[in-house]
Curated annotation (Swiss-Prot):
The keyword Ribosomal protein applies. Belongs to the universal ribosomal protein uL5 family. SUPFAM superfamilies: RL5-like (SSF55282). This is Large ribosomal subunit protein uL5.
Length: 180
């Protein structure tokens, strides 16, 4: 079964964007390419056990096993050695990406305290959107009793849009709650 949001994209988003930006070809309409979720754990240099919790939680949130990111070079001021684990990340594509985006927009973001919408200024100039989350507990997959420390994460939504206006229109029609 295809993801619910993929059907929404094909039936509602594509016609709306084609009308708004007057695309001549359906393939020119912007679409979600991938979603990258990254957790940076600077404290993992002192305590390596913190990394295990982050990897497990990110795996539960994303639905696939994360990759552990390692330091590319040593920095003495940060007490960091080359090759030391400093974070973890996941790249989602296809149905998993649509399911995660659906959960993010409809379940997780509304659970943020005092949530009034996400900023529309976090585009990079090429239609890609980045958002930071301070607490992983907004996702329903995380069991509150098993969390040792709250961890934030960066979520980067990569689209095929050429401009920020196209990217904003794409995400807005797919249900992303932008601040007015």
């Amino acid at each position: 079964m295809a993801a619910r949001l993929r059907e929404h994209y094909q039936t509602k988003t594509v016609p709306a964007l084609t009308k708004e930006f007057s695309y001549k070809n359906v393939m020119a309409v912007p679409k979600l390419e991938k979603i990258t979720i990254n957790i940076g754990m600077g404290e993992a240099t002192q305590n390596a056990k913190l990394m295990d919790g982050a990897v497990n939680e990110l795996g539960q949130i994303a639905g696939q096993k994360p990759v552990i990111t390692k330091a590319t070079k040593s920095i003495a001021q940060f007490k960091l050695r080359e090759g030391q684990a400093i974070g973890c990340m996941v790249t989602l594509r296809g149905d998993r990406m649509f399911e995660f985006f659906d959960r993010l927009v409809n379940v997780a973001l509304p659970r943020v305290r005092d949530f009034r919408g996400v900023s529309s200024k976090s585009f990079d100039g090429r239609g890609n959107y980045t958002l930071g989350i301070k607490d992983q507990l907004i996702f329903p997959e995380i069991d509150y009793s098993k969390v040792d420390k709250t961890k934030g994460m960066n979520i980067c939504i990569t689209t095929t849009a050429r401009t920020d206006a196209e990217g904003l229109a794409l995400l807005r029609t797919m249900g992303m709650p932008f601040r007015q």
